[in-house]
């Protein structure tokens, strides 16, 4: 195994940042821990969506269309995410950081993997609002597409890449407010009722705003950790294996609660 190790001798241990994004998307979706079954099993889910209905009108004109809500049954497959870490006794004895860093990255890698699938579902949002600039009006107009009757108690959030966040700060200035109640990793500020979070792997020129109802993570609770007993062959060469696995599926279950704000210029 090609681990890069060192003789632990008067060296400080620096661990590289290996998270694709520190933003835990499980806190931004509905988590359903009732998932049962095994990898490859099918699950049918009703996915709700709505058509756009906002129009710019002149005096005396009225809307020619209205927002329509519908649902479609979609079939999802239960996923199994698994990784393994292998090392030899001699490697662990030579470098005391090998096993802690390796096992920690098992969790990091699993986190990145599940996060990517959740974000992929947010990116399926069918409602969109094009804008020439990420200004106050853009966030208010995009929020209106969700057609929420009562905003009380509803938390709307937005995922923004770092480059676009700089543009937003310049465009919004005093309209970007910092609300202590929403402070968590990545939180930058709130505009027009939308809490903005920096996500370093978000797409440039595209901001996704949503509520927790948009995406559901169906989760078989807990991550399984297995360290199988060594076979005779592995024992002979002093080889160890640790395995972690997780069963889950992420689904855009309510497309009426997610909107893409896309930059046109």
How would you name each of these model-derived features?
Residues 36-39, 199-204, 230-238:
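Short, ordered beta-strand-loop transition motifs
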Residues 53-56, 167-170, 251-253:
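Short helix/loop capping segments that flank catalytic or ligand/cofactor-binding pockets
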Residues 41-43, 83, 154-156, 192-194, ...:
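Structural beta-strand/beta-sheet cores of well-ordered domains, especially the beta-sheet scaffolds
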Residues 230-265:
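Extended, compositionally biased alpha-helical segments that mediate assembly or anchoring
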Residues 82, 86-153, 260-265:
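Alpha-helical scaffold segments that mediate packing/assembly in large oligomeric complexes
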Residues 140, 144-224, 236:
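Extended oligomerization regions of viral-like shell subunits
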Residues 1-71:
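N-terminal "assembly arms/tails" that initiate or stabilize quaternary assembly
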Residues 70-79:
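Short glycine/proline-enriched loop/turn "hinge" motifs that connect secondary-structure elements
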């Amino acid at each position: 195994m090609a681990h890069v190790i060192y003789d632990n001798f008067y060296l400080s241990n620096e661990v590289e940042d290996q998270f694709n994004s520190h933003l835990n998307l499980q806190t931004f979706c509905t988590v359903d821990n009732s998932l049962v079954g095994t990898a490859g099993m099918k699950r049918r889910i009703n996915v709700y969506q709505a058509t756009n209905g906002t129009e710019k009108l002149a005096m005396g004109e009225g809307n020619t269309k209205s927002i329509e809500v519908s649902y479609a049954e979609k079939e999802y497959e239960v996923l199994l995410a698994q990784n393994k870490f292998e090392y030899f006794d001699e490697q662990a004895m030579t470098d005391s950081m090998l096993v802690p860093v390796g096992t920690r990255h098992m969790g990091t890698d699993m986190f990145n993997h599940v996060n990517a699938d959740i974000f992929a579902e947010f990116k399926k949002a069918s409602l969109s609002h094009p804008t020439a600039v990420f200004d106050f009006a853009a966030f208010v107009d995009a929020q209106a597409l969700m057609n929420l009757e009562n905003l009380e108690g509803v938390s709307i959030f937005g995922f923004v890449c770092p480059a676009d966040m700089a543009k937003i700060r310049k465009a919004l200035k005093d309209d970007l407010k910092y609300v202590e109640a929403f402070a968590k990793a990545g939180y930058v500020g709130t505009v027009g009722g939308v809490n903005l979070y920096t996500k370093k792997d978000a797409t440039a020129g595209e901001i996704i705003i949503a509520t927790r109802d948009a995406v559901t993570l169906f989760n078989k609770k807990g991550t399984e950790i297995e360290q199988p007993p060594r076979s005779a062959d592995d024992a002979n060469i002093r080889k160890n294996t640790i395995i972690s696995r997780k069963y889950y599926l992420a689904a855009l279950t309510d497309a009426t609660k997610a909107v893409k704000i896309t930059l046109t210029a």
